[in-house]
Amino acid sequence: MTNIRKSHPLFKLINDALIDLPAPSNISSWWNFGSLLGICLLIQILTGLFLAMHYTSDTATAFQSVTHICRDVNYGWILRYLHANGASMFFICLFLHVGRGLYYGSYIYTETWNVGILLLFAVMATAFMGYVLPWGQMSFWGATVITNLLSAIPYIGTNLVEWIWGGFSVDKATLTRFFAFHFLLPFIISALVVVHLLFLHETGSNNPTGIPSDMDMIPFHPYYTIKDMLGALIMILALLLLVLFSPDLLGDPDNYIPANPLNTPPHIKPEWYFLFAYAILRSIPNKLGGVLALVLSILILALMPLLHTSKQRSMMFRPLSQCMFWLLVADLLTLTWIGGQPVEHPFIIIGQLASILYFLLILVLMPLVSIVENHLLKW
């Protein structure tokens, strides 16, 4: 009799994805982040579900309901801070996952890569709408500033913004619909994750060398299940340290002030994980130009398969490309720092130079360096 896990239609799916899946024997810890992202998504959905049971999406009571969760609900404080800091862990894993894909040429699997970009946009949209829900000062003004960017779209911009707001300013209708979408999107993300995995399992995983590994595969279980469990343990430990010792480290103190449309905070800034894009947005004096640069800063990832000029897939044996990659990482860290600074000298010019360098590296320098490497290797 065949083993039930190989014959039962449901168990067979799980078996082929998590147990008998052939995996390259040499994938490093950089390949752990896919499973870590899955765990992050699960943590966010579970904590979010319990928070939604106590939250009210009304401008009059939203702020109070969050306070009520933290003070009166059993373990409500840990739910709230797990959810808020879980988002930060989610983005740390996301950025490392995308960085791994760039470094090792995983974007050559175009379908998997493009679904991944869709996932990135969906997670960013979810995080933005979630940040609005506590209805603090930064929630309100962040929502006002970011939704207002759509008014830069020619002809339909103003109508579009008012349609999204459900009125002439960010108000009750906006908060209610943001809550509805914030609840809905994680389930859409879950569906996209399944599609992402479906495409990945069509081709199999890439590996650090970028060389096909069909002749040297090992079963996913027990080798990579135990490896993923170690990664999960480290991540959960880091998350718990953050939640239990300094839960407000990554938040903005202004969000402990209830939303007030008559009082603008001195520095409006998003959560840390959006600062790099916010810095690019602010670097361009023109509104429409800034919005386009903001969208393109993420959408440019879709061009990566077209910009791959090297004859090798991975950067493992390409020292010049490695220099460009780490320059890009340093540039993104600079942009993140600039995004949190006030708009004044010297931060303006640093932000503009970092923004130019970001696009220059991806569109010009990295493809050029790859061509140079091909010639150096006489290929």
UniProtKB/Swiss-Prot annotation:
It comes from Ptenochirus jagorii (Greater musky fruit bat). Pfam families: Cytochrom_B_C, Cytochrome_B. The chain crosses the membrane at residues 33-53, 77-98, 113-133, 178-198, 226-246, 288-308, 320-340, 347-367. Its cofactor is heme b. Component of the ubiquinol-cytochrome c reductase complex (complex III or cytochrome b-c1 complex) that is part of the mitochondrial respiratory chain. The b-c1 complex mediates electron transfer from ubiquinol to cytochrome c. Contributes to the generation of a proton gradient across the mitochondrial membrane that is then used for ATP synthesis. It is found in: Mitochondrion inner membrane. Keywords: Electron transport, Heme, Iron, Membrane, Metal-binding, Mitochondrion, Mitochondrion inner membrane, Respiratory chain, Transmembrane, Transmembrane helix, Transport, Ubiquinone. This is Cytochrome b. GO terms for cellular component: mitochondrial inner membrane; respiratory chain complex III. The cytochrome bc1 complex contains 11 subunits: 3 respiratory subunits (MT-CYB, CYC1 and UQCRFS1), 2 core proteins (UQCRC1 and UQCRC2) and 6 low-molecular weight proteins (UQCRH/QCR6, UQCRB/QCR7, UQCRQ/QCR8, UQCR10/QCR9, UQCR11/QCR10 and a cleavage product of UQCRFS1). This cytochrome bc1 complex then forms a dimer. The gene is MT-CYB. Its main location: mitochondrion. It comes from the Eukaryota. Heme 1 (or BL or b562) is low-potential and absorbs at about 562 nm, and heme 2 (or BH or b566) is high-potential and absorbs at about 566 nm. Binds 2 heme b groups non-covalently. GO terms for molecular function: metal ion binding; ubiquinol-cytochrome-c reductase activity. Heme b b562 binds at residues 83, 182. GO terms for biological process: mitochondrial electron transport, ubiquinol to cytochrome c. Belongs to the cytochrome b family. Heme b b566 binds at residues 97, 196. A ubiquinone binds at residue 201. SUPFAM superfamilies: a domain/subunit of cytochrome bc1 complex (Ubiquinol-cytochrome c reductase) (SSF81648), Transmembrane di-heme cytochromes (SSF81342). It is a multi-pass membrane protein. InterPro entries: Cyt_b/b6_C, Cyt_b/b6_C_sf, Cyt_b/b6_N, Cytb/b6-like_sf, Cytochrome_b, Cytochrome_b_C_euk/bac, Cytochrome_b_N_euk/bac, Di-haem_cyt_TM.
